[in-house]
């Protein structure tokens, strides 16, 4: 039996982070968590590109374009959809989830899903550095692990 476990070595990796401006009280905290975690794991700040988009619904389009270009090793998507502030909550959540999932499967590089979908702002803030940790940070470690696993598979 062979077991593969990804590492968190980010040196020499180029990372794209796509961040929704809508609900930026939350998304800026997610970005801070992702950025700090990438830096702590060896990713140079010069190798991190941040793309701001209007809202979560626009994230898949930009992720697709970045993935097709192939000039990054991985993509982190960050957004916050809060039910109480969005009258079309289900439609936005469904579209964003489907779009990012499709790019993750069909794109050239790993994509991490860091779009929060919560009932209220308190839940969102708890997941952006509050009681429930920082999902941006979790996406960063997950992305580094996925990049390493995929590179291992490609070498075999």
Curated annotation (Swiss-Prot):
Organism: Pediococcus pentosaceus (strain ATCC 25745 / CCUG 21536 / LMG 10740 / 183-1w)
UniProt GO BP: riboflavin biosynthetic process
GO CC entries: cytosol; riboflavin synthase complex
Active site: 88
Gene: ribH
Lineage of producing organism: Bacteria, Bacillati, Bacillota, Bacilli, Lactobacillales
Function, in words: Catalyzes the formation of 6,7-dimethyl-8-ribityllumazine by condensation of 5-amino-6-(D-ribitylamino)uracil with 3,4-dihydroxy-2-butanone 4-phosphate. This is the penultimate step in the biosynthesis of riboflavin.
Stated name of the protein: 6,7-dimethyl-8-ribityllumazine synthase
One MF term in the entry's GO annotations: 6,7-dimethyl-8-ribityllumazine synthase activity
Residues noted as binding 5-amino-6-(D-ribitylamino)uracil in the record, renumbered to the chain: 22, 56-58, 80-82, 113
Catalytic reaction equation(s): (2S)-2-hydroxy-3-oxobutyl phosphate + 5-amino-6-(D-ribitylamino)uracil = 6,7-dimethyl-8-(1-D-ribityl)lumazine + phosphate + 2 H2O + H(+)
Chain positions recorded as (2S)-2-hydroxy-3-oxobutyl phosphate binding sites: 85-86, 127
Family named by the database record: Belongs to the DMRL synthase family.
Xref: InterPro entries: LS, LS/RS, LS/RS_sf
Pathway(s) this gene product operates in, as recorded in its UniProt entry: Cofactor biosynthesis; riboflavin biosynthesis; riboflavin from 2-hydroxy-3-oxobutyl phosphate and 5-amino-6-(D-ribitylamino)uracil: step 1/2
